[in-house]
Amino acid sequence: MIEADRLIAPDNPVFKDEDVIDRAIRPKALADYQGQDHVRGQMEIFIKAAQMRNEALDHLLIFGPPGLGKTTLANIVANEMDVNIRTTSGPVLEKAGDLAALLTNLEENDVLFIDEIHRLSPVVEEVLYPAMEDYQLDIMIGEGPAARSIKIDLPPFTLIGATTRAGSLTSPLRDRFGITQRLEYYKVEDLQNIVQRSADCLGLSMESQGALEVARRARGTPRIANRLLRRVRDYAEVKGDGHICPEVADKALNMLDVDAKGFDYMDRKLLLAIMEKFGGGPVGIDNMAAAIGEERDTIEDVLEPYLIQQGYLQRTPRGRIATDRAYLHFGIDKPSNR
């Protein structure tokens, strides 16, 4: 797996120790939530309406690529509603009892946040349906012929589910969410604002153009932007006086092998393999995985999304194709037969 050594992988477990810093710089209110204007505008209305009616917010599904702020948005919703939030994830809820324990401890209008909700087991999902729809918990007591079902009334609550794979949710679960929000990759100017805000929270001396340099290479992802900012800070403190200007940011990011487009060595390895080994494509995913020594799932879930979104790679029925933009980026002449 490449996650362990990729600085720009959105879900890199190596950087879990930096979660404390992430929480410190994470916005707490919608007013501080940068970018995703359509989401912010809609949520302001939905939250205000729920507050005016003094009721729980409708169940909310948030989906999109990793690192775009799904957890941040869930916490903001709880803060704006002035309620408690309990956080868990799909893989952790192995048994129906695990979910029941969480649900029965919720107070009125509280938020239950389930990350990776697409990984819920069918047994747990079945328990969730009546809880979401009727605020009731159906539990089986006993086994065999003596088994009986009891119903437990739950207080009104808001379930917030987050996923990178909305298509993997079952239709019955997806249809029970009253609000659905898709998070998109961030514009550079929004990321620049996020980097500048994070620098201020960390007490860093940073020029706006320095923040822009970090934002340009952050792959449209706030989590990556904040991670790069911390590494640029390290470089500025060791190699200079701690002040981050565009030149310092550029040198630090080049040292990290993150180029002007936010590509690291794995992105370049993938695109170059298609162009140099397969004549630009089309090439099947399994052949591509073998060529670069990576797993199919890693290529599809980690490497490809950003390259496709930025127009450097195309998925076609016949396989993957490197685009004209990819050839231009690397300064390679496109084969005459393409």
UniProtKB/Swiss-Prot annotation:
Positions with a binding annotation for ATP: 25-26, 67, 70-72, 133-135, 176, 186, 223
Start and end residues of each stretch annotated as Head domain (RuvB-H): 260-338
Chemical reaction(s) catalysed: ATP + H2O = ADP + phosphate + H(+)
Primary enzyme class: hydrolase
GO BP terms, alphabetized: DNA recombination; DNA repair
SUPFAM superfamilies attached to this UniProt entry: P-loop containing nucleoside triphosphate hydrolases, Winged helix' DNA-binding domain
Disulfide bond positions: none
Residues that, per the record, bind DNA: 296, 315, 320
Region (Large ATPase domain (RuvB-L)): 4-186
Subcellular location: Cytoplasm
EC number in record: 3.6.4.-
Superkingdom of source: Bacteria
Family in the record: Belongs to the RuvB family.
Entries under NCBIfam families matching the protein: PRK00080.1 (NF000868), ruvB (TIGR00635)
Free-text comment on this protein's domains from its UniProt entry: Has 3 domains, the large (RuvB-L) and small ATPase (RuvB-S) domains and the C-terminal head (RuvB-H) domain. The head domain binds DNA, while the ATPase domains jointly bind ATP, ADP or are empty depending on the state of the subunit in the translocation cycle. During a single DNA translocation step the structure of each domain remains the same, but their relative positions change.
This protein's name: Holliday junction branch migration complex subunit RuvB
Species classification: Bacteria, Pseudomonadati, Pseudomonadota, Gammaproteobacteria, Vibrionales
Name of the coding gene: ruvB
